[in-house]
Amino acid sequence: AAQDDATILAIRDQERAGLDIITDGEMRRESYSNRFATALDGVDVDNPGVALDRSGHPNPVPRVTGPVRRKYPVEVRDVQFLRANTDRKIKITVAGPFTMSQQAQNDFYDSEEALALDYAAAVNEEIRDLFKAGADIVQLDEPYMQARPEKARAYGLKALNRALEGIEGETAVHICFGYAAIIHVRPSGYSFLPELTQSPVRCVSIETAQSSLDCAI
């Protein structure tokens, strides 16, 4: 009930601000990715692993111990609640498969690519259910494409394309610039962006408040 109340407040704030596209404020999530990543089969949530974050610091992460599969729709109720509480266009976000593969300790798969592709299959199932539930836009959050561009080129784009395979609704992908990380020397542009022309994604969301950021691709 408290999360529902907080979500309604977030919706009304966005409406009063005049936003055309409304989100639920993600009040129900402990993080942008773990809400989905820890709800999957093949993940040991009781004994987490360790992986390096975007700034190189070790963090507790989901530990993959078996085949990654979606057990049930994770965010469908979020969409249904959002749809019932606004008449504006609505957007929901899901953690991207490449990013989830980078935020996991892989104790099962022979390669990170195989892990990312199974995450992608689970995300694909989720996206289909989110559109059925009333989402107008589904966005995949892929901050690690900017943080680890070589791996993103090697198999991240393949995983993203698998996640979007056969999807007909409006989709977006968000790539962070890394504002949350304590990095003293910041790059002036994105390390992974033109590559998204090889994806069926219809919209690219980037961060552009960074001083001196060159938005050219």
Located regions from the model:
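Domain-level signal for soluble alpha/beta catalytic cores
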Residues: A1-I217
